[in-house]
Amino acid sequence: MAAPLCRSTEVIMAGGVALKSWEHLRGPVAHDNWWANFVRASTICIASIQAKDPKASIVWIVYRPAYIARGKEEGKDYVRNIRETATKYKVKLVWADTAEQACRAVNKAAPVTSFYYFGHSTAHAMMLDYSNDIIAASTQWIHEKDIGQLFRKEAFAPNAYCISYGCYTGNSMSASWQKALGLPLWGNTESTRYYPVGDGKFPEGAGKWVH
């Protein structure tokens, strides 16, 4: 008897938003005027995957503390909103309270055929927390030097498609991802802009998409 085929998984990771009260102090360089930038980008991605394969297995990993804090700030239950969104799209929601938990969730989703990251980043790290615990700083991140320790290479399919919609990923982290996991990680060389998600489109990069 042939062994049963192992169902592949599409993984979407959503980082956290900043506190609006802190970001307003930064004037024209403020981030995250809308709490749902990364959530909306995730649902656009989910819909895109399901349009191609209605039965696709999708795991949505969301950094929870930021949405709890932003929700308290604005008097809204954003955690419930995200939970209801996951139910609507019939995807598996995995809450992560730390960067390490988020990475473990990716490893458990094996075999991963695609990985999408929506959130803040620098050239060297994906920042699941940004300007939420500390203004203009991160307390939970996935640094490029830790990729090989945080992610299992075997968790990804040999031809897995990986892309980061964070800022500046293409300048360094893409190369580190390739070195550690043997897979291309598409990333932009400049900032990424999330205003297109309001029109149902993926975020745009101000620079070149490279891997």
Q: Residue spans of the language-model regions?
A:
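Short, basic/hydrophobic alpha-helical segments
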Residues: S42-A51, R104-N107, I142-F156
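Non-Sec secretion/translocation targeting segments of pathogen effectors
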Residues: M1-L5, F115, S164, V210-H211
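Catalytic cores of nucleophile-dependent amide-cleaving enzymes
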Residues: V112-V197
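Structured partner-binding subdomains within large eukaryotic complex subunits
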Residues: N188-T189, W209-H211
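Short, charged, surface-exposed secondary-structure boundary motifs
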Residues: Y194-P203, H211
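A domain-level signal for caspase-like cysteine endopeptidase catalytic cores
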Residues: A2-A102
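Short aromatic-enriched loop/helix-cap "lid" or pocket-rim segments at secondary-structure transitions
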Residues: E73-E74, D129, D199-G200
